[in-house]
UniProtKB/Swiss-Prot annotation:
Transmembrane segments: none annotated. This is 1-deoxy-D-xylulose 5-phosphate reductoisomerase. GO terms for molecular function: 1-deoxy-D-xylulose-5-phosphate reductoisomerase activity; manganese ion binding; NADPH binding. HAMAP family: DXP_reductoisom. It holds the Pfam family DXP_redisom_C. Signal peptide: none annotated. It comes from Bacillus cereus (strain AH187). Belongs to the DXR family. Catalyzes the NADPH-dependent rearrangement and reduction of 1-deoxy-D-xylulose-5-phosphate (DXP) to 2-C-methyl-D-erythritol 4-phosphate (MEP). Keywords: Isoprene biosynthesis, Manganese, Metal-binding, NADP, Oxidoreductase. 1-deoxy-D-xylulose 5-phosphate binds at K121, S147, E148, S172, H195, S208, N213, K214, E217. NADPH binds at S10, G11, S12, I13, G36, K37, N38, N120, E122, G201.
């Protein structure tokens, strides 16, 4: 029986993580979780899983939950999030929160020698050097939950990582993969939220449409697998059947395939190095699929992917700036305050405005994050 703490239980990854726990009640126990403002959902999860600690975003929601929570301790805010991440009984902390708020809980959980199931891209994007240094220092495993990084992780099992020639990350292309840049001037929030292959939260769905999601994944892959950016490629693959590939020095390429179902990489992170049945996921049927398509990625068409490569290669504090600018811009787009292509413009402005710090401390990263958010808000 593995004890799990789940950060971000009400989001897309969080709800699917609970599906995995539900499928294997003899294997996993939920000891703590966090939610944002979805209190009704939190009540249902408490009643089903009887965790010891639950964290909510707002203090005013604590009393509401205490009234129905029985023996579950209710905490709130950033301190509450840390309490969930540091639950003494938790062996695995699944970080499924959205945004850079996931950074500090991840670092503290690593220091407490918890195994980390990392679904929060922004943690490695904003502070990859700090996170990987901490993981090495405390001998902690970072197990990828993203389908692409899980695919690479699985392809590398038993392999000599020094023999990697290239990582090939696949991208569905998102909601607007077939639109020209001229057409993108007129797209709506509702258009952007209709992803062709995956069911995800609103922020990551917009990131998929701008291709920033893939850019974040490139930076994340750089840190997780220690591969230079020059050896990380992105290829358009509309069907989302091949989740990513690894090319080795002898030009052999290993790929991980499967139907699009996020529960598969989530479960693998929880069961690694073992596997368990996931009987209700769709079996891959290649002869029904017939043809798989691949296209070269155009970084002028998808400018956010280019920004991510530039930020990653620049290094230091630049990825944190790019990420903070993106979070603010995406939120403004979701609120219909800016157009779709303005997201790119705001990110570019923030990156051009920033003076890079080569090896920022945690405090500097948090300060830069806040300053970038203020700068972008002033531009809107």
């Amino acid at each position: 029986m593995k004890n799990i703490s789940l950060l971000g239980a009400s989001g897309s990854i969080g709800t699917q993580t609970l599906d995995v726990l539900r499928s294997h009640p003899d294997q996993f126990r939920l000891v703590a979780f966090s939610v944002g403002k979805n209190i009704d959902y939190a009540v249902k999860v408490i009643q089903e899983f009887s965790p010891q600690i639950v964290s909510v975003q707002r203090e005013e929601d604590v009393l509401k939950l205490q009234a129905v929570s029985g023996n579950t301790k209710i905490v709130y805010g950033s301190e509450g999030l840390l309490e969930v991440a540091l639950h003494p009984d938790a062996e695995i902390v699944v970080n499924a929160v959205v945004g850079s708020v996931g950074l500090l809980p991840t670092l503290r959980a690593i220091e407490a020698k918890k195994t980390i199931g990392i679904a929060n891209k922004e943690t490695l994007v904003t502070a990859g050097h700090l996170v990987m240094e901490a993981a090495r220092k405390h001998n902690v495993s970072l197990l990828p939950v993203d389908s692409e990084h899980s695919a690479i992780f699985q392809c590398l099992n038993g392999e000599n990582e020094k023999r990697i020639s290239r990582l090939i990350i696949t991208a569905s292309g998102g909601s607007f993969r077939d639109k020209t840049r001229d057409e993108l001037h007129h797209v709506t929030v509702e258009d952007a939220l209709r992803h062709p292959n995956w069911s995800m939260g609103s922020k990551i769905t917009i990131d998929s449409a701008t291709m920033m999601n893939k850019g974040l994944e490139v930076i994340e892959a750089h840190w997780l697998f220690g591969i230079p950016y020059e050896q990380i490629d992105v290829v358009l693959h509309k069907e989302s059947i091949i989740h990513s590939m690894v090319e080795f020095e002898d030009r052999s390429v290993m790929a991980q395939l499967g139907s699009p179902d996020m529960r598969v990489p989530i479960q693998y992170a929880l069961t690694y190095p073992d596997r368990l049945p996931l009987s209700d996921t769709k079996q891959l049927n290649l002869w029904e699929m017939g043809t798989l398509h691949f296209e070269k990625m155009n970084q002028e068409r998808f400018r956010c992917l280019r920004f991510a490569y530039e930020a990653g290669k620049t290094g230091g504090s630049m990825p944190a700036v790019m990420n903070a600018a993106n979070e603010v811009a995406v939120e403004a787009f979701l609120q219909k305050r800016i157009g779709f292509l303005t997201v790119e413009d705001l990110i570019e402005k923030a990156m051009n405005h920033h003076n890079v710090i080569a090896r920022p401390s945690l405090e500097e990263i948090l300060e830069i994050d806040a300053a970038t958010r203020r700068f972008v808000m002033e531009q809107i």
